[in-house]
Amino acid sequence: MGAGMLAAGGALAAQEKPIAGFDQTETDIDESSVWEPKSDRKIRVGIVGYGLCHFGAAFGFQDHPNVEVVAVSDLFPDRCAGLAADCRCEKTYESLEELIKDDSIEAVFVATDAPSHPDHCIKVLESGKHVACAVPAVWGDLDAAYKLYETVKKNAGLNYMMFETSTYHDAVYATRQLYNAGILGNMIYSEGEYYHHFPENLPGYRGWRDGLPPQWYPTHSNAYYVCATGGHSFTEVSCYGYKSRYPHFQAENNPYGNPFGTEVALMRTSEGGMARMAVSWDTPGWGGEVGRNRAEKGSFWNRFEPVDATVAEAASKINIKKPALPPTLAPGSHGGSHGYLCNEFVESILENRKPLVDIAWALNMTVAGIISHQSALKDGEKLAIPQFEF
């Protein structure tokens, strides 16, 4: 195959897969487990946002036995119609603001453009509804982070959950099971990487993806520490960026004044350990999310490697495979995570408990990236990272 054909094939693949991760559907499920319903109640859900990758319909709310999708919305009529068709829903609204006036809706999935996430989630919560949101929680704005945080705390009894897909990657799930059982001890070193090559701007509402700072979209990589350790956080960071050769990552050519196509952060963790978290938009090659963890009593990279036989025996008693989902709900994309995120949000409401990726987890992943980008703009200056508890 000639170089021209290889290049053409690569370009075609990029067109067919504009967003990385949607073709990654394999996952490790405990085949002996059986899903047991928590209730026969159906939560009435509204979904907002269809977008470039049909995201509002991608997490399976329409297929969950405890959900009735009663209304959908997108600002563009053709996309709204597509979302309604995918969700098998007849009622549509022209905007999120109109949808949340519907008193029959109990919960809303916000799958809108990233800059709108905090404002939209605040509006949903203030309308008296639970909210699940696509990543990231906020868009480069610390004030928005604190405002969202205070709104969630003020609206006790309503759930906020961020749908970070790495949470249910096989490796992150397995590490979390071992960590929460006390098998690993403290986490010494974590790595998370998110690679998504786009040599040209991807479409986005009002151009929000144009030249976006890599560490403003940090949660896929940061989850390899935060979600692997059940919610621990980062305390300080030194981050470096690479000034990209691509025109849309020239500071004068994008709305963020961002010169970087790749940013790599070295962070101190709340356990006293270290984490290296990378996000890259301008390096060709394999794309997706990956990571690894090294702890006091063992390491996990595709498999668990214990320090000794005693730890190995203890680990053998922990089920590190994901449990069964409702038979009608597929695990979905991004490492078989979509269905699990949907199910966790639904069951957290049914059981009146906090969801797994609550506001603290969400902001501890997102804000660390915001500070990392600030550090990169200051040539790696070490900066403190705010931490959130809930």
Model-derived regions: residue spans:
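Predominantly a Rossmann-like dinucleotide-binding segment in NAD(P)-dependent oxidoreductases
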Residues: 154-161, 166-258
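Contiguous beta-strand/loop segments that form the cofactor/metal-binding neighborhood of enzyme cores
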Residues: 23-39, 216-308, 339-355, 369-373, ...
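N-terminal Rossmann-like dinucleotide-binding module
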Residues: 7-87
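C-terminal capping/lid region of NAD(P)-dependent oxidoreductase domains
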Residues: 158, 185-189, 374-390
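Conserved SAM-binding strand-loop segment of SAM-dependent methyltransferases
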Residues: 89-96
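N-terminal secretory signal peptides and thylakoid transit peptides that target proteins
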Residues: 1-7
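Glycine- and charged-residue-rich phosphate/anionic-cofactor binding loop of Rossmann-like
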Residues: 68, 348-365
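Beta-strand-loop-alpha-helix segment that lines the small-molecule cofactor/substrate pocket
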Residues: 107, 113, 118-167, 182
